[in-house]
């Protein structure tokens, strides 16, 4: 089983470096979550782009539990209460990986009277960036990520297939449904081999558009159900190069259509690759 190292989203106040087995949620955990109030943990930087975007997302779209916004200090004071849940950015490491990079995950945790954050039950979490990547490269997607997590948790309530360590593999069965949508990608999220429009069109049989991040943010705001977009998590030019996560997320229906990752090495570049496009054709 893989092991994780978690630290809190804010390095200014405190940091927790602990190793723990990955928690697999139970049906009882999911049922308990729906009886909690969810506390959304904001970062300490008052100018944080993430803070602004996640507040907008939660206030507009979060409906499954009552919610309140708190800071990191309050999180430390409240996290042992089992009647509370938390939406929080944590940093994750995979000690068994050859290159031990740190990744930001947007996670939903249950309160528990435990010493370590790693022992708090995690309902689910989605990778959003490498730890040292500027939040402007991903914060614009926050509304889609928050609504996807909400939809995923609702699905967990009735679908036991999602109660697994590899819960997002479940969504790859939706891969064929992407053919009826427009796939929007930002150029920097494509591997170098796939950055020409001719290459994209020759390797992907359906509609694909290279757009700006502002276009994706606008589509998310408008809940454009004709659009799916690439959410890529990679080093973005930073020194640490390890995993590259690739997700195709639907807008409006808040569904995941594709989930995969590869280790960056040799021809395995930072971004969506030609082999991913070919998988999406099927």
Model-flagged regions — what are they?
Residues 1-26:
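Bacterial Sec-dependent N-terminal signal peptides
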Residues 38-41, 108, 183-184, 200, ...:
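A compositionally biased, intrinsically disordered/low-complexity signal enriched
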Residues 48-54, 77-79, 96-98, 192-196, ...:
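Extracytoplasmic/secreted cell-surface and envelope-processing proteins
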Residues 59-70, 199-211, 252-254:
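Structural alpha-beta junctions
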Residues 90-147, 216-282:
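Amphipathic beta-strand/beta-sheet edge segments enriched in Tyr/Trp
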Residues 124-179:
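A surface/extracellular/periplasmic glyco- and lipid-processing/surface-interacting theme
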Residues 158-240:
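Flexible, glycine-rich surface segments
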């Amino acid at each position: 089983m893989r092991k994780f190292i978690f630290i809190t989203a804010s390095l200014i106040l405190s940091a927790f470096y602990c190793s723990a087995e990955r928690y697999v949620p139970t049906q009882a955990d999911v049922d308990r979550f729906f009886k909690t109030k969810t506390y959304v943990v904001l970062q300490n930087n008052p100018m944080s782009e993430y803070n602004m975007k996640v507040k907008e997302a939660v206030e507009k779209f979060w409906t499954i539990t009552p919610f309140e916004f708190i800071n990191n200090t309050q999180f430390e004071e409240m996290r042992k209460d089992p009647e509370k849940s938390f939406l929080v950015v944590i940093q994750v490491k995979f000690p068994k990986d050859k290159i031990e990079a740190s990744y930001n995950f947007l996670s939903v945790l249950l309160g528990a009277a435990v010493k370590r954050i790693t022992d708090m039950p995690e309902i689910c979490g989605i990778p959003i960036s490498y730890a040292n990547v500027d939040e402007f490269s991903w914060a614009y997607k926050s509304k889609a990520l928050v609504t996807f997590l909400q939809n995923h948790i609702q699905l967990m309530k009735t679908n036991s297939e999602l109660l697994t360590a590899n819960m997002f593999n479940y969504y790859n069965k939706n891969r064929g449904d992407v053919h009826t949508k427009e796939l929007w990608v930002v150029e920097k999220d494509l591997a170098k081999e796939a950055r020409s429009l001719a290459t994209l069109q020759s390797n992907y049989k359906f509609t694909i558009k290279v757009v700006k991040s502002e276009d994706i943010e606008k589509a998310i705001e408008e809940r454009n159900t004709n659009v799916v977009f690439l959410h890529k998590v990679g080093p973005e030019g930073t020194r640490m190069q390890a995993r590259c996560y690739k997700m195709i997320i639907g807008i409006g229906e808040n569904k995941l259509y594709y989930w995969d990752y590869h280790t960056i090495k040799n021809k395995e570049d930072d971004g969506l690759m030609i082999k991913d496009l070919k998988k999406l054709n099927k």
